[in-house]
């Protein structure tokens, strides 16, 4: 098991990474929060695979658990779904010290975190991420949010978990599409933060695709450490943390304009290719860098170009991005593998030109 610590203005929590950690949940949980009752928020598919085993494990250690099973998908990450959860917490007599365990991927983590942040002004949150994307990205850093009015993550806050338990054994059961979505975030982290990880992915593509336990624990740990380091420098996303949104400016716009039928990982993959091409157009990086990134993305079965887009609608959606400042869209652009920068005052004709090129 590997442990990564986040120290945020005196508040510290750990990200624990290793195989079969779900079977140690009770012990690891009690080291962070003494408790004998928990609420587990999950979805139908994850509950079917892990719910019974986790419930039995918790009960064997004297921890009573209420499992709340939600429908699957980004479309359900809403205020209405949060409103559906609150009465169940009240009826279960969940108290301010009753932990909420988020068992699932990014949608479950975001929604559970939003509920934990707002129920009784905040209850303990524990992430049990089961998808690759959530293990390396969404469970780390305290962003919690729901979608509203067709805009992704527009209602939310920062609310740090008390603990993250990332069981890499869960990755064995991930469908190929979900695994590829997680790889988009790993490639993103390598592109902005580690030329060594970028090269590792290029030279060990098949071992990663085969989900070798040793390789997966290594790259999950490296990716989580990159994000943890950046979050510790800028918890509330006012500066350097913006670079974690490499690929997300276009990515979120693609998700929103597709009514969330476009998966997050696929959208971010396309967004990274767009950002790299825009970087080349602006003379910020070599064309070879963009080509290496596109090849790596394609090698993991992810798309590199959008389909059936309206560039004007895409730009309109970009103006809802949380990085927008004084009406100006901020883009995260690439200099070379392992180094990115935050750019403002990008001209609309340049953006449109790259979008047209990618159609």
Swiss-Prot record:
Positions that bind Zn(2+): 185, 248, 264
Molecular function per GO: 3-dehydroquinate synthase activity; metal ion binding; nucleotide binding
Binding site for NAD(+): 72-77, 106-110, 130-131, 143, 152, 170-173
E.C. designation(s): 4.2.3.4
Pfam families for the chain: DHQ_synthase (PF01761), DHQS_C (PF24621)
Cofactor binding note: Binds 1 divalent metal cation per subunit. Can use either Co(2+) or Zn(2+).
InterPro entries from the UniProt entry: Dehydroquinate_synthase, DHQ_synth_AroB, DHQ_synth_fam, DHQS/DOIS_N, DHQS_C
Keywords: Amino-acid biosynthesis, Aromatic amino acid biosynthesis, Cobalt, Cytoplasm, Lyase, Metal-binding, NAD, Nucleotide-binding, Zinc
Catalytic activity: 7-phospho-2-dehydro-3-deoxy-D-arabino-heptonate = 3-dehydroquinate + phosphate
Gene Ontology CC terms: cytoplasm
One BP annotation, GO: chorismate biosynthetic process
Pathway(s) served: Metabolic intermediate biosynthesis; chorismate biosynthesis; chorismate from D-erythrose 4-phosphate and phosphoenolpyruvate: step 2/7
Database matches in CDD domains: DHQS (cd08195)
Essential cofactor(s): Co(2+); Zn(2+); NAD(+)
Location(s) in or outside the cell: Cytoplasm
Family affiliation: Belongs to the sugar phosphate cyclases superfamily. Dehydroquinate synthase family.
NCBIfam families: aroB
Reported function: Catalyzes the conversion of 3-deoxy-D-arabino-heptulosonate 7-phosphate (DAHP) to dehydroquinate (DHQ).
Name of the molecule in the record: 3-dehydroquinate synthase
Organism: Dehalococcoides mccartyi (strain CBDB1)
Lineage, broadest ranks: Bacteria, Bacillati, Chloroflexota, Dehalococcoidia, Dehalococcoidales
Designated gene of the protein: aroB
